[in-house]
């Protein structure tokens, strides 16, 4: 339990810059700064977990692929905004306009989207030797949990309209180690397995087929951010590796906490 003095200090650190209110997210990971940013977009107040670095980082995103950027984020899109922009065409426009609204360069910022408020964000960090892994997650799975390989999909790209559900499990993984492209891809697999383990431990069942265990939601996404330390290079992030263990532990812990916060599990 955090003391009142700690909470007061956090509140004092909240600030307004050019009309944007920011509340810091405490990280032991010193290579990045993280905060929840509140921003008016059109006539709706949204918020996002924004993680920034001093230099460009190689990142692998399930939304944008392999990129080099200084900023990554997880954006809460409230329902009124979701109804306007969560179709394929209008979402592309949203991804172009939001960085401008935030005062960020579009080419230096990639983000995920969710119907989960960033006030329900969860963080887990773990170290081993010279490895440091940090997971920042949000999660909601009451409305669109599914079991992959069992549940049916109903959206056909370019033919039918897709709407963002109020759930979604989004993960941002940070590490100080320089990850190869293969290690970043395997990290997504490792963290996804950990996410499914969190759902299993919490007893989530498919929303559409309640008799089967859920493995995720239909809109989950992830960003993996590589470190830049040339002396700490990691090629393998599977479950038998120490780096894989750190990724799995932090992802499972953060996702579990995030789901408890938003879904009251």
Which residues does each PLM region occupy?
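Alpha/propeptide regions of enzymes that mature by internal proteolysis
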Residues: 2, 7-265
């Amino acid at each position: 339990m955090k003391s009142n003095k700690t909470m007061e200090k956090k509140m004092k650190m909240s600030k307004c810059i050019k009309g944007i209110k920011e509340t810091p997210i405490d990280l032991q990971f010193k290579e990045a700064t993280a905060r929840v940013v509140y921003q008016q977009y059109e006539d709706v107040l949204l918020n996002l977990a924004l993680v920034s670095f001093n230099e460009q980082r190689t990142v692998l995103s399930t939304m944008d692929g392999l990129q080099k950027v200084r900023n990554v984020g997880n954006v809460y899109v409230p329902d009124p905004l979701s109804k306007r922009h969560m179709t394929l065409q209008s979402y592309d426009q949203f991804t172009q306009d939001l960085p401008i609204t935030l005062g960020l360069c579009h080419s230096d910022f990639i983000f995920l989207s969710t119907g989960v408020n960033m006030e329900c964000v969860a963080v887990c960090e773990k170290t081993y030797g010279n490895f440091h892994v940090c997971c920042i997650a949000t999660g909601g799975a009451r409305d669109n949990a599914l079991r992959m390989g069992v549940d049916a999909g109903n959206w056909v790209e370019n033919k039918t309209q897709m709407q963002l559900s109020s759930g979604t499990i989004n993960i941002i993984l940070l590490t100080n180690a320089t990850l190869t492209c293969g290690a970043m891809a395997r990290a997504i697999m490792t963290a996804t397995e950990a996410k499914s383990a969190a759902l299993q431990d919490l007893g989530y069942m498919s929303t559409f087929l309640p008799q089967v265990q859920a493995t995720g939601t239909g809109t989950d996404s992830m960003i993996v951010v590589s470190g830049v330390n040339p002396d700490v290079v990691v090629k393998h992030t599977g479950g038998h590796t120490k780096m894989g263990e750190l990724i799995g532990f932090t992802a499972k812990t953060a996702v579990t906490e995030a789901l408890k916060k938003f879904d009251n599990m």
